Protein backbone atom coordinates (compact mmCIF):
# COMPACT_ATOMS: atom_id res chain seq x y z
CA UNK A 1 0.00 0.00 0.00
CA UNK A 2 1.14 3.54 -0.72
CA UNK A 3 0.28 6.60 1.34
CA UNK A 4 0.06 10.05 -0.21
CA UNK A 5 1.69 12.70 1.97
CA UNK A 6 1.88 16.44 1.57
CA UNK A 7 4.51 18.39 3.46
CA UNK A 8 5.57 22.00 3.68
CA UNK A 9 9.30 22.01 4.30
CA UNK A 10 11.54 24.73 5.63
CA UNK A 11 15.00 25.17 4.11
CA UNK A 12 16.74 22.76 6.50
CA UNK A 13 14.21 19.96 6.02
CA UNK A 14 14.20 20.46 2.25
CA UNK A 15 18.00 20.37 2.09
CA UNK A 16 18.23 17.22 4.22
CA UNK A 17 15.54 15.49 2.17
CA UNK A 18 17.28 16.29 -1.12
CA UNK A 19 20.60 15.06 0.29
CA UNK A 20 19.09 11.71 1.29
CA UNK A 21 16.71 11.26 -1.67
CA UNK A 22 17.74 13.54 -4.57
CA UNK A 23 14.79 12.49 -6.76
CA UNK A 24 12.41 14.27 -4.36
CA UNK A 25 13.82 17.61 -5.52
CA UNK A 26 11.87 17.25 -8.77
CA UNK A 27 8.64 16.96 -6.76
CA UNK A 28 9.26 20.05 -4.62
CA UNK A 29 7.64 23.38 -5.43
CA UNK A 30 9.08 26.60 -3.99
CA UNK A 31 6.44 28.65 -2.19
CA UNK A 32 6.30 32.45 -2.03
CA UNK A 33 7.63 32.44 1.54
CA UNK A 34 10.73 30.42 0.61
CA UNK A 35 9.46 27.12 1.97
CA UNK A 36 8.86 24.07 -0.20
CA UNK A 37 5.72 22.08 -0.91
CA UNK A 38 6.16 18.35 -1.45
CA UNK A 39 3.47 15.89 -2.47
CA UNK A 40 4.66 12.31 -2.78
CA UNK A 41 3.76 8.71 -2.04
CA UNK A 42 5.50 6.59 0.56
CA UNK A 43 5.38 2.84 1.13
CA UNK A 44 5.67 3.25 4.90
CA UNK A 45 4.70 5.99 7.32
CA UNK A 46 7.57 5.03 9.62
CA UNK A 47 10.34 6.73 7.63
CA UNK A 48 8.48 9.92 6.81
CA UNK A 49 7.15 9.97 10.38
CA UNK A 50 10.66 9.81 11.79
CA UNK A 51 11.71 12.58 9.39
CA UNK A 52 8.81 14.83 10.40
CA UNK A 53 9.25 14.20 14.14
CA UNK A 54 12.98 14.82 13.91
CA UNK A 55 12.47 18.16 12.17
CA UNK A 56 9.03 19.04 13.56
CA UNK A 57 9.88 22.73 13.85
CA UNK A 58 10.78 22.93 10.14
CA UNK A 59 7.97 20.80 8.66
CA UNK A 60 4.20 21.19 8.44
CA UNK A 61 2.01 18.24 7.49
CA UNK A 62 -0.70 19.27 5.05
CA UNK A 63 -3.85 17.33 4.17
CA UNK A 64 -2.35 13.93 5.06
CA UNK A 65 -4.74 12.30 7.55
CA UNK A 66 -2.97 8.92 7.75
CA UNK A 67 0.37 10.57 8.47
CA UNK A 68 -1.22 12.91 11.00
CA UNK A 69 -2.79 9.92 12.76
CA UNK A 70 0.53 8.05 12.75
CA UNK A 71 2.36 11.08 14.18
CA UNK A 72 -0.28 11.54 16.89
CA UNK A 73 0.13 7.89 17.88
CA UNK A 74 3.93 8.14 18.03
CA UNK A 75 3.77 11.36 20.06
CA UNK A 76 1.27 9.84 22.49
CA UNK A 77 3.45 6.74 22.84
CA UNK A 78 6.49 8.92 23.53
CA UNK A 79 4.58 10.96 26.13
CA UNK A 80 3.51 7.78 27.92
CA UNK A 81 7.02 6.42 27.80
CA UNK A 82 8.41 9.59 29.36
CA UNK A 83 5.68 9.95 31.99
CA UNK A 84 6.16 6.36 33.12
CA UNK A 85 9.90 6.83 33.30
CA UNK A 86 10.41 4.04 30.78
CA UNK A 87 12.85 6.03 28.75
CA UNK A 88 15.83 5.32 31.03
CA UNK A 89 15.76 2.53 33.61
CA UNK A 90 17.91 2.65 36.75
CA UNK A 91 20.16 -0.05 35.27
CA UNK A 92 20.60 2.02 32.12
CA UNK A 93 21.36 5.09 34.25
CA UNK A 94 24.14 3.18 36.02
CA UNK A 95 25.57 1.96 32.70
CA UNK A 96 25.50 5.48 31.30
CA UNK A 97 27.21 6.86 34.39
CA UNK A 98 29.91 4.15 34.19
CA UNK A 99 30.50 4.92 30.53
CA UNK A 100 30.80 8.63 31.24
CA UNK A 101 33.26 7.99 34.06
CA UNK A 102 35.34 5.61 31.91
CA UNK A 103 35.41 8.12 29.09
CA UNK A 104 36.51 10.89 31.44
CA UNK A 105 39.22 8.65 32.91
CA UNK A 106 40.49 7.77 29.43
CA UNK A 107 40.53 11.45 28.47
CA UNK A 108 42.43 12.31 31.66
CA UNK A 109 45.03 9.62 30.93
CA UNK A 110 45.39 10.87 27.35
CA UNK A 111 45.80 14.45 28.57
CA UNK A 112 48.55 13.40 31.00
CA UNK A 113 50.62 11.55 28.41
Feature names for model-found ranges:
Residues 1-113:
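Polybasic (Lys/Arg-rich)
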